[in-house]
């Protein structure tokens, strides 16, 4: 039963050396140079406004160049010279008792003073719009703050700007929910959930109504020029209403900042062929077959009006969006439903 022994196997003492991989130099990271990671949803990964609007905004944004500073300095010097010349002419007319020249100089001075006053009012309104952006940045900081007292004062200031007094039901619910242990972040979150939706609901209602009116008007209007004029008028009115809801009074220059997106709507209303092609892609084949070309154009114009309203809300709103940002798809479903009802009534 003894098995034969296997032959001996001799191994070399030195095994062949495998090539060692070359290691890269180590990298040291600290907390200051590291970038915090926060996961985002797929909807937030692609901005809803689109790259076209960002390109237009970048193109229309004024650039502070050397030539512009030289022009501003020249205008300021010319204004000072004109003011000095006016004072000298007024003095000479008074000394020489030239009453006709004195009356003309006085009238011109009143007109210039009115113009300067209008520019001062416009600058104040533009500063108010820029201040709203600073308030939004402050709100972002408070949402990450664990301090106390600042959040409540900030929210009470926003309520006064919006015209909400202490007797408003939303303000009373917010004040009843506050506790001494709440920090700034918790106070601001309560305000965003109890008080801010009062204004947001009104703004959404204005957007829905303007988008519906634009849709129906474009659908029945036979002239492209009428379409463009109607879209421009409705969009300007929508901007003014949204700004007034959030306690902002728009002037000429401050309205220009929000008017940039109106240009997209005007161009959209004039490009009828492009509207027809894009409108057919937005809807299902069954619904597109039942709609006319003008109805498809109306839905497209209504969607861009809704997008303009969402952008105006974002610029006029004092708080950043938490999880209640309006989506274009919500307004799209409303517009398609209204077009369906209109077609059914017309039969």
Swiss-Prot record:
Its main location: membrane. Residues 1-48 are annotated as: Disordered. The keyword Membrane applies. InterPro entries: DUF697, UPF0283. Keywords: Cell inner membrane, Cell membrane, Membrane, Transmembrane, Transmembrane helix. It is found in: Cell inner membrane. The chain crosses the membrane at residues 70-90, 99-119, 213-233. HAMAP family: UPF0283. This is UPF0283 membrane protein ECA1987. The lineage of its organism: Bacteria, Pseudomonadati, Pseudomonadota, Gammaproteobacteria, Enterobacterales.
């Amino acid at each position: 039963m003894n098995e034969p022994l296997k032959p001996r196997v001799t191994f070399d003492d030195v095994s062949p050396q495998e090539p060692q991989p070359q290691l890269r130099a180590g990298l040291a990271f600290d907390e200051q140079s590291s970038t915090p990671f926060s996961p985002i949803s797929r909807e937030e990964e692609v901005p809803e406004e689109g790259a076209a609007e960002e390109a237009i905004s970048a193109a229309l944004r004024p650039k502070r160049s050397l030539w512009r500073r030289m022009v501003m300095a020249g205008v300021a010097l010319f204004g000072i010279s004109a003011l000095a010349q006016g004072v000298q002419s007024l003095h000479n007319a008074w000394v020489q008792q030239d009453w006709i020249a004195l009356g003309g100089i006085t009238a011109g001075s009143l007109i210039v003073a009115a113009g300067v006053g209008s520019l001062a009012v416009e600058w104040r309104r533009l500063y108010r719009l820029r201040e709203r952006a600073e308030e939004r940045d402050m709100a972002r900081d408070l949402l990450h703050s664990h301090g106390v007292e600042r959040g409540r004062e900030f929210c009470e200031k926003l309520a006064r700007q919006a015209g909400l007094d202490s007797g408003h039901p939303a303000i009373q619910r917010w004040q009843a929910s506050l506790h001494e242990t709440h920090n700034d972040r918790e106070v601001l979150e309560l305000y965003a959930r109890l008080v801010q939706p009062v204004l947001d609901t009104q703004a959404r209602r204005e957007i829905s109504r303007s988008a519906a009116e634009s849709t129906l008007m474009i659908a029945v209007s036979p002239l492209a020029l009428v379409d463009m004029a109607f879209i421009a008028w409705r969009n300007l009115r929508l901007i003014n209403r949204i700004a007034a809801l959030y306690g902002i009074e728009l002037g000429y220059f401050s309205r220009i900042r929000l008017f940039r997106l109106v240009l997209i709507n005007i161009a959209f209303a004039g490009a009828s062929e492009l509207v027809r092609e894009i409108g057919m892609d937005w809807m299902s084949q069954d619904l597109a077959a039942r709609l006319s070309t003008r109805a498809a154009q109306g839905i497209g114009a209504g969607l861009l009006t809704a997008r303009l309203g969402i952008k105006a809300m974002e610029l006029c709103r004092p708080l950043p969006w938490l999880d209640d940002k309006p989506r274009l798809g919500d307004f799209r479903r409303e517009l398609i439903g209204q077009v369906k009802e209109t077609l059914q009534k017309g039969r």
